[in-house]
UniProtKB/Swiss-Prot annotation:
Belongs to the RNase Y family. This is Ribonuclease Y. Its main location: membrane. InterPro entries: HD/PDEase_dom, HD_domain, HDIG_dom, KH_dom, KH_dom_type_1, KH_dom_type_1_sf, Ribonuclease_Y, RNase_Y_N. Residues 215-300 form the KH domain. Pfam families: HD (PF01966), KH_1 (PF00013), RNase_Y_N (PF12072). Endoribonuclease that initiates mRNA decay. It comes from Chlorobium phaeobacteroides (strain DSM 266 / SMG 266 / 2430). Residues 341-433 form the HD domain. It is a single-pass membrane protein.
Length: 525
């Protein structure tokens, strides 16, 4: 019993000692662990702060770099703008100096003319004094002659006076005739000098680049592989393209180039736009060709209107009707003696306007009449001369009588009724007289021959379109499939060929091709 109690006490004491020791030992380890955690947290905090500072510094450097780059960019733009402004200022300063020099020269010329006039006035006064002296001397001599005549011939004073007057009148008439002739010669010389000065001033103040129009357009392609797609299976794409546009398409060995050939610049430009659209889409077949052609026609209408608006804007011609503006733009695709008709009309307008300014006439009216003088060339075919057709067309838009007369008279079809008409005619002659202009008459004659071939074929019933191809060696006729049968197509080809033989002179032979196509369309609903 006593041993058990002692053992129990020992166990309790051991437990108390173990518990107390464990408590202090645990507290010790907890304090150590807490201290370690705190140190780690502090180190982590320091690390986070350092990383944040590093990121902040990097962000700051990035933003500073961006700001510096933006500042440098703005600085470069500012420097460039300053250079441009300085160049413009220097150019304007040069122009001002030139104008100042011109004004000084004109002022000096005026002073010289004033001195000359003063000298001439003095000479005239001296001449008048001499004339008065001679008149007095003449009266004295006349009196002496009268006295001598009376004493010698026993004539009455009135009779002698009449004889003397007749002699003096005859001599005066002779001198007056010589003076009038001299005045006429001087007036003609002054008029020639003034006209020469006016023309030289006008010509020197304008400059136009002119090039003879040819019948070819070049379309660049990305690779020669596209040529096969342009040709199509058994050439069907080329045939569809030529039928739609009326333009020859030439695919040869020239790398990355396709050539379009046609005498009509407008038709050739339409074909060029059509081919470019097909190349962009990458899909080439007959239906796509027709769609691209229709899209090109809409686009060319916008181009024509833009060309007309740009022309009247550059010439500062106000209040031009929209229909007339469209015809002016259409001049871009016509030629006259090898010159582009729009460029020719602009050149004539500039010349006429400058000459009108030199002669103190209305420059705006002169430019308006000159720009419109060849508008008859872009009107539908007419039996009237193009000058008369242009005048009659412009009458519908209430153009002024001066403009109408200048348009109608520039080829001598009617009498010129104003100085403006003379200026327009002169400017037209100057423009067409440039070196090489008249050398293109043969080309224009060729175009007329091709147009006559197309007109002959169009005169037959059932014909939709006609195209003269291969420099006039082939006339391709597209007919209505529903109205012209196969047998009628053969007869039509024969009739067209016979009419061409009787009305057109040409070397070699002309092939007449009739194309008859019939389409059946149905819609599934």
């Amino acid at each position: 019993m006593g041993i058990f109690f002692i053992s129990l006490v020992l166990i309790v004491l051991a437990s108390v000692v173990f518990f107390v020791g464990g408590f202090f030992l645990g507290r010790y380890f907890l304090e150590r662990i807490g201290t370690t955690k705190i140190l780690e947290a502090e180190e982590r905090a320091v690390q986070i702060v350092q990383e944040a500072q590093k990121e902040a510094n990097e962000y700051k450097e990035l933003k500073v770099s961006e700001v510096n780059q933006e500042w440098k960019k703005k600085r470069r733009e500012f420097d460039q703008e300053v250079v441009i402004k300085n160049n413009k200022f220097n150019q304007m300063q040069k122009q001002v100096l030139q104008k100042e020099g011109q004004l000084k020269k004109q002022s000096q010329d005026l002073r010289d003319m004033e001195r000359k006039l003063q000298d001439q006035r003095k000479e005239i006064e001296q001449t008048m004094e001499t004339v008065n002296l001679r008149s007095s001397e003449l009266e004295r001599i006349t009196l002496e002659q009268n006295q001598r005549l009376e004493s010698i011939s026993n004539l009455q004073a009135d009779e002698a006076r009449q004889m003397l007057v007749d002699n003096m009148l005859a001599k005066a008439r002779e001198e007056a005739t010589e003076t009038i002739h001299q005045i006429h010669e001087e007036a003609e010389q002054q008029a020639e000098r003034l006209a020469e000065k006016t023309l030289l001033t006008a010509i020197q103040r304008i400059s136009f680049e002119q090039a003879t129009e040819n019948a070819l357009s070049v379309v660049h392609i990305q690779s020669d592989e596209l040529k096969g797609r342009i040709i199509g299976r058994e050439g069907r794409n080329i045939k569809a393209f030529e039928n739609a546009t009326g333009v020859d398409i030439i695919v040869d060995d020239t790398p990355e180039v396709v050539i379009l050939s046609c005498f009509d610049p407008l038709r050739r430009e339409l074909a060029k736009l059509t081919l470019q659209k097909l190349l962009v889409d990458g899909i080439i077949h007959p239906v796509a060709i027709e769609k691209a052609y229709e899209d090109a026609k809409k686009e060319i209408d916008d181009v024509i209107m833009s060309a007309g608006e740009e022309t009247i804007s550059s010439l500062q011609i106000p209040d031009m009707p929209a229909e007339v503006v469209g015809l002016i733009g259409k001049m871009k695709y016509h030629t006259v003696y090898g010159q582009n008709l729009l460029q020719h009309s602009r050149e004539v307008a500039m010349l006429a306007g400058l000459m009108a300014s030199e002669l103190k006439l209305d420059a705006r009216v002169a430019k308006r009449a000159a720009l419109l003088h060849d508008i008859g060339l872009v009107l539908p075919e007419s039996d009237e001369p193009h000058a008369i057709a242009g005048r009659n067309f412009l009458k519908k838009f209430n153009e002024s009588a001066v403009v109408l007369n200048a348009v109608a008279a520039h080829h001598g079809d009617v009498v010129k009724e104003s100085p403006i008409a003379e200026l327009v005619d002169a400017a037209n002659v100057i423009s067409l007289s440039r070196p090489g202009a008249r050398g293109a008459v043969t080309a224009d004659g060729n175009v007329k021959r091709l147009e006559s071939l197309e007109e002959i074929a169009k005169g037959f019933p059932g014909v939709l379109k006609t195209y003269a191809l291969q420099a006039g060696r082939e006339i391709r006729v597209i007919v209505e499939g529903d109205n012209v049968s196969d047998s009628q197509a053969d007869v039509l080809a024969h009739d067209i060929a016979r009419k061409i033989e009787s009305e057109v002179q040409y070397p070699g032979q002309i092939k007449v091709s009739i194309i008859r196509e019939r389409r059946s369309i149905a819609y599934a609903k």
